[in-house]
C-alpha cells in the first residue's frame, strides 16, 4: 500500500469524516475514494491538491517525502 493511502485514511479518521464526506469534497464517488485509500487506484494530482488545501497539509507530507530527509 502506498504511504499516501494510509496517511489519507488517518487524516480522514482524525477529522471524524467518512469516505463519503471526502468523496463529496473531491466530486467523486465513495467507491472511488475508497480505492484511493486502499491504494488500488492512484490519486490524481487534482485530488491531491484539493485534499492538501482541505486538510491544510503539504503534498510532501501526504506523499511521505518529508519523512525521507
Predicted regions, residues:
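DNA major-groove recognition helix of helix-turn-helix/homeodomain DNA-binding modules
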Residues: 46-61
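Conserved hydrophobic/aromatic packing and binding residues within compact polymer-binding modules
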Residues: 8, 22-23, 33-36, 62
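Short, basic-rich loop-to-helix N-cap that marks the start of a DNA-contacting helix
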Residues: 40-50, 69
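Residue-level detection of the helix-turn-helix DNA-binding "recognition helix"
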Residues: 13, 27, 38-40, 67
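Short basic helix-loop element that most often maps to the first helix and adjoining turn
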Residues: 6-25, 50
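Short, charged recognition helix plus adjacent turn
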Residues: 14, 53, 63-69
Amino acid at each position: 500500500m502506498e504511504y499516501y493511502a494510509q496517511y489519507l485514511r488517518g487524516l480522514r479518521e482524525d477529522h471524524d469524516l467518512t469516505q463519503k464526506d471526502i468523496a463529496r469534497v473531491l466530486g467523486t464517488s465513495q467507491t472511488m475514494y475508497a480505492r484511493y485509500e486502499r491504494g488500488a487506484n492512484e490519486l490524481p494530482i487534482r485530488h491531491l491538491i484539493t485534499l492538501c488545501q482541505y486538510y491544510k497539509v503539504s503534498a510532501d507530507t501526504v506523499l511521505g517525502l518529508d519523512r525521507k530527509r
